[in-house]
Amino acid sequence: MNAVGIDVSKGKSMVTILRPFGEIVSSPFEIKHTSSDIHSLIKLIHSIEGESRVVMEHTGRYYEALAHQLSAADLFVSAVNPKLVKDFNNDSLRKIKSDKADSVKIARYALDKWQSLEPYSITDELRAQLKVMNRQFHFYVKQKTAMKNNLIGLIDQTYPNANTYFNSPTRSDGSQKWVDFVSTYWHVDCIRKMSLNAFVEHYQNWCKRKKYAFNKSKAEEIYTKTKELVPVFPKNEITKHIIRQAVDQLNSTSVTVETIRTLMNETASKLPEYSIVMQFKGIGPSLGPRLMAEIGDVTRFTHKGALTAFAGVDPGVNESGSYAQKSVPTSKRGSSNLRKTLFQVMDVLIKTMPQDDPVYQFMDRKRTQGKPYYVYMTAGANKFLRIYYGRVKEYLSVFPDPS
């Protein structure tokens, strides 16, 4: 048995090959992530007598190209959680951190865990692309939130509280009514210079041009409030440029978010479990694809507990002797993006209150018992995943491919 430990980094890796009882087949050596170096590594591993298993840490995206190439060459590859390697066999008082030492440690880990190593599975392109889109979606949502807060901070200097006049949801093209409003009426003097009738007429034409619903009483309310506001910045070209620039940046990011949201739904609809996932209460064309992106192929989980552990919503355990802690926080060792999506699904269930949904009934019962907010929300996420696992896996066993 030959344990190949690979410490992966950007563009290069450190490789060590060991056998039981400390026998060194190959001392640590470096390879580049090029086709020639990877081919040479594959040739070397195949030339060694006995069964060989390759182990590496799944850190970021650096390992995927190497793991994919080695798996395609009919080698046993296992990508393990970096924390498992970090906590493995720390029996030295010396603290050594180098690529060579890490590759040796990974090889020793492979020998010790030989029988329990899980083979690396190549994710199909559709699921991989969906997951990348979901990560990009989360990235741009953060950017959108930052730009929205920036715009609100700016208009507080020219038109305080203008962002609170409308609560219309974001359109499919990324536009929002309050953002379009402050783009046109970027300063209180844009309205105060007009009479009430003139503003109502101007606002009506603006609503018609932007395809928003017009309400005369709303226009009169805005005019009355605006008359009492005190701006900080003067109404000039510099102020106008600052506000319009912030609006353009927010609109651009918002368009990107909605484009990715639509593309994710189109991509997810090609997966076999799409129809059954969309039947869950609390799931829609936005949350459904995001949930499917983070969970991936549910059949790779051996049981329900494996899925809840993957999400990090499994209950913790703290017992010693006669002591047993009753309330233990969840592990939170899994995907933070998945936990966030689950929390949003639970939030939808709490707000819509579907009386026939077992997850909502469970959360409502916990809430009635006086459980804290985060306790019943996390418990609901755990129950949701267990139901998700059962329904989706059963569906895929009957209808594995919609085509």
Task: Tell what function each PLM region has.
Residues 1-403:
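A detector of single, family-specific signature residues
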